[in-house]
Each structure stands twice: as structure tokens, then as C-alpha cells.
Amino acid sequence: AALASMGRQLEWAQFRAMRSEPEESLRLASAWKNSCRPFQVQLKPVQVRQRLKNYLATLTDGERQFYLARPVGSGGPSLQAFLDGAAAPALQDGLGFHALSLDAQAKPVEVMHSDDSFLMFLGQPDRAQVEQTLRMLELEFPVGLMTGVGPVVANPAYSLDERHARELGRGAYHGTVVWGWQSALMTAGLLRQRELQPELVGRIDKVLLRLWECERNARTLANSELWTFSVESGDWSAQAFGQGTASTDESNPVQLWSCVYPALVYRWQQAGLAFPATR
């Protein structure tokens, strides 16, 4: 997506002296786009159930009970009921997402993540790709990416490698934490797709509103580099990253991308959305 965007920009008049770069960027973009197929993960409902059961077994009792009581999609059954066999409309066709990477045997590392934000903002995804991204954001963690304080950047619940649940937890910089700039990029990307996929405007608007509400729930932490969360109180609660003994790194309170939200407010207003326009 980034290469394709670069190619389009290099075709502008001010870059005409760089004659070969636009074609090379677009050629590489096409090659990488075709290489995405091995990264696609598609799980059947029975596989989703089993992998979620395995993941929940790695959590504390308090975490597990909280997640089991949460709904699987809007109006869906509780996660406990789904694991016991109840049908969840949001998962009737299973669950698809892009793998985090490929392993040494070129097999997908089945960790769900939020990097589709780049595709939404810079790429030309088809309807199916946009719907796949929306589905991940419509589903609460650990089924999807969304928490009450923003989308996590990685969800290891579906990985067959038991190390990932441990190494990509709430204390890991690249784990089940919320990155402010990634969430902002997803919002900007969906605002763009709102124009390109008019038949999906209703779903996109609901996800955009949810993204905004969740970031507001993070309060002052929403302007920091990243934050983690807890559910021990019986609800989602944003927590500063790097403060706990289990944290593997620390967070810088304010970085350049912390200033991205005024631009997003402008885009919201341009789109005529009746969502909260202030943070």
C-alpha cells in the first residue's frame, strides 16, 4: 500500500524528473500485493472456538470470567455461550485476518493485528478486504481487536504457538496494547474507505464511532504513545504502559503522532459525521 501511494505521488508534475521511480514503485507494489495471499488466515467456527478456549486457559480467572461474559459481536451470544456451541451471527462464516508474518517454513504466524490500517489509508482494498477489517474491529478482544479503550495492535488468541500468548501480552510493546498512532491511522483509513465503499458506510460509521468512544475512554492516556488495559475491575480500564513489573519497555508520554487528532477532527467534519468532534 505504501509503495503504491509513493508511485502515485511520484507521478505528480513536481517529480517528473524522477522518470523511473513511479513505475518501479508501482511494480514493487503489485509484486507485494500478489504476495499477500500466503498471509491470509481463514478459520472455521469450530477452529475459532478451540483456539479461544486454548487462549483463555492462559489467562487469570478474573480475566477469563470477564471475557466469557462479553458478547460475540453486536447482539450476539456471550463468549461462554459461543464456546458451548451457540451460533454467533458475526462468526457464521468463520473468521479471516492477515497473519502477522510467515515462519521459516513459509507458514502463516496466526496472530491477528491492526496493520490493515495501512491498507485502509494508503491502499485500494476491495470490499471483502474492507469487510474483513471491519469485522476485526466489530469484535471485542479476545475474539477480535477492540477493547473498551481502543483496538489492540496484536491478538495472539488464534496462534498455535503457545509462546505468543505469553510474549504478546499486556506488558509487551508489540502485544495486546493500544498504540495511539495506529488507532488514528485506522480512523483515517476508514474515513477514506467511507468515500470509496459507499455501500459499507453504515458499518464504517458504527466502527468509527466505536473507535472514537474507546479513545475517549482512555482519557489523558489517549495522547500518549501507547497504553495497556486491565479488566480486573469488571470493566475495561486504560492503564499507563511501562508502569508494571511485567512490562518489557516504557512509553513516551507525548510524541509527534500525539498531535494527529486535530487533522482527524477536520476529516470528520468534512465527512459531515455527527460524531463527537472533540477529545
Residue ranges and their predicted role:
Residues 1-279:
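Acidic, mature catalytic/reactive cores of soluble proteins
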